[in-house]
Amino acid sequence: MLAYYVSVNQGPGIEQKSLPQLTRLLDQGRVKALVFIRDTSTGQTFLEGRYTRPAGPTENAEIVVPFRTVVDLEFNRDLKQFLASKGFPEIDVKVIHNFWGQAFLSVLPFLLFILALYFLFRQQIRMAGRGAFSFGKSRARLLSGGKTKVTFKDVAGVEEAKEEVQELVEFLKDPKKFQKLGGRIPKGVLMVGPPGTGKTLLAKAIAGEADVPFFSISGSDFVEMFVGVGASRVRDMFEQARRHAPCIVFIDEIDAVGRARGTGLGGGHDEREQTLNALLVEMDGIESQEGVIVIAATNRKDVLDPALLRPGRFDREVRVNLPDIRGREQILRVHAQKIKLSKNADLSALARGTPGFSGAELANLINEAALIAAKKGKDNVDQPDLEEARDKVRWGKERRSLAMSEEERKTTAYHEAGHAVLNVLLENTDPIHKVTIIPRGPALGVTMMLPASDKYNARKKEVLDDLCVAMGGRVAEEVFLGDISSGASGDIRQATWYARKMVCEWGMSEKLGMVHYADDSSMVFLGRELGTSRGYSEATARAIDHEVQHFIQAAYEKAKRIILEHKDKVEALAQALLEYETLNADQVTEIVKTGKMTNPPSKNSSPVSNGGEASSTKSPARQEETTKDGGLLPGLEGAPA
C-alpha cells in the first residue's frame, strides 16, 4: 500500500525539476502548461506541467515531457510576477485529497508497534509453557522402554535397592503372581540415600525395563512464578497418569516440593504447601486410583512432610547407600567397559583403596584416569593412572606451580611429619598411604591415610588416636620450630567437631554419660529452628564445652609426649620430605622404624620452591559420619600454613 501511495503521488514518468531548472525552461519558452497543486495528505504544494524537449537523432518531432516542481507559490510574489511575465498570469489551482493514503500513513507506526509486541509475546509464551494457557499443564516427560538404553545390568553396587525396585517391574509385567495371594503393588516407593549413589540411575533402569508408560519429572518443575501453577501441574500430571494406567511416575528431588509444612517465614512457602497438599490428595485421597505407582528420590528425607511418608502414599522406603568394597568393584567394572584398560590394571585393589566413594565419584575416577592416560600419550589406562586419578578425586590435583618460601616449606614438612609419625606409631589408626608437601587442592601438604576395610562404627580408642594424630601437626611445629602457624586450623576445627560428637551424640564422655545432647542442626528450616529449644541447661552446656576441651587437650598432651620421645624420627621424616617432597607408605614406615630410608624415591623435577599446606587428610572411614570438609578425620581439610 505504501508503494502504491507513493506511485500515485509521484505519477508515471513525471520528471522532478528544481526551481532554477523551471526558471531556465521558462526563459527558453519551452513550458507549455502549468497547474498549481495542493496535496492535503502530505501538505505539499507544487507546480505541475509539461515542457518540450528537442527531438533526438531517431525522433521526428519534439517530445512533450511532464514535470513537477515543489514550490510554495502562494507566498512567493517574485515567482508569481516572473510567471506572469512569461505568459502565465493566472494559474489554475488543483487540490488533491488522498484519504486512504493519509489514513494508512497515520496508523502505520501503531501497526508496526502492535506487530512487534505480538511477535515478542508469542516468543515468550512459547518459552514459558508451550502456549498461553499451558502454565498449569504438567511438565512430566513420558518415556518408554525404547527411549532409554539404561537397564538393570547397568546398575551395580546397590543390589538390595535394585531387587526392591525390580519387584515393581515384575508386578507390572505379571500382576497375577502377586494378586493370587492377596498382595497389592506398593502405591509409592521412596528412594533415599547420599548424593551420587544411583537413585536416578535406578529410575532410568526402571524406565528401560518396564513395559508400561513412565512419567519423569523433577520436584522443581512444579514450582512456577505464578500462584496456583504447582497444584495445577500436580493434578494434570496424575490425570495423564490415570489415562495411561498402569504406569509409573518418577519424581526426582521430591524435597523441592515435599518439604514439611508450617516452616519458614513469609508467604513464599504457601504456594509450595498448596502444591504439596495437591500431591498428598492425588497420591492417597478420595479420587486416588490404583495403577499409578509413584517413585521418588531424595537425599534429604529428614525435611519431608510426615504425611507424605506414611504408608498409602510411600509404602516402601528403599535405602541406596554408599557401596561396599564388592559394590565399588562392580561399579568400577561397569564404567571400565567404556575405556581401554590395560591388563595390569587391578580394579579389586582400586576398590579397596576407595572406601566412602559413591558411584558418581567412581565414575568420575575412571574418567579422570582415562584423561590422565590420554594426556601422557598412552594407548591404554594402567594401574598408576588409576591410582593418580584416585588421589586427584579424593585429595585434589597437585599444584606444583604454587611458589612458597623455604621457611614455609620447612613448616609444612615438620607439620606433615608430625601427623605421619603419630599415625605410624599409634595402634588404632588407618594405614598411611602417602605423605607429600606438594600442594593438593586447598591443602599445602597432605598426609593421606586409607582404611584397610570399610568401617561403619567408630570405636572410642580409634577416635582418641585420630584426635592425637590431628594434633601432631601443631605439636611438631611447636617442638621443632619454636612457633606455631595457622596450618593447624583445619585440624583444630575437625578435631573439635569429632570431640563434640563423642560428648553429645556417642556417649563417650564418662562425666556426662550416655545422654543425647546434640541440637538438631541438620534441620535447615528457619521456622523449625525458631520453634526448637535447647534440651539442656546452661550448666550442662558449660560441662559439654569442658569435656570437648578435655578430649582435645588430652590428645594434644599425648601427641606432644610421643613426638618428644621420637624427635629423631620426626626430624628424619621432615628432612626426607624437604628433599623428595613425596613419600609413600613403605618409605614413611621405614624412616619411622629405622630412622633411615634404603629405597628413596627419585627427586621431583619441580622447583624446590613448591611447597604444601600443613594439613592431613584421611578418607571417610565411617560412611555414616561425614561433614562438609575433607581431612584427617572424616571430612578434615587443611588451612593455610
Swiss-Prot record:
EC number: 3.4.24.-
Membrane topology: Single-pass membrane protein
Stretches in topological domain Cytoplasmic: 122-641
Binding site residues for ATP: G193, P194, P195, G196, T197, G198, K199, T200
One Pfam family recorded for the sequence: AAA_lid_3
Gene3D superfamilies named among the record's database cross-references: 1.10.8.60, P-loop containing nucleotide triphosphate hydrolases, Peptidase M41
Annotated binding of Zn(2+), by residue: H415, H419, D491
PROSITE patterns given in the database record: AAA
Transmembrane segments: 101-121
Quaternary structure and interacting proteins, as annotated: Homohexamer.
Function recorded in the entry: Acts as a processive, ATP-dependent zinc metallopeptidase for both cytoplasmic and membrane proteins. Plays a role in the quality control of integral membrane proteins.
Record-given protein name: ATP-dependent zinc metalloprotease FtsH 2
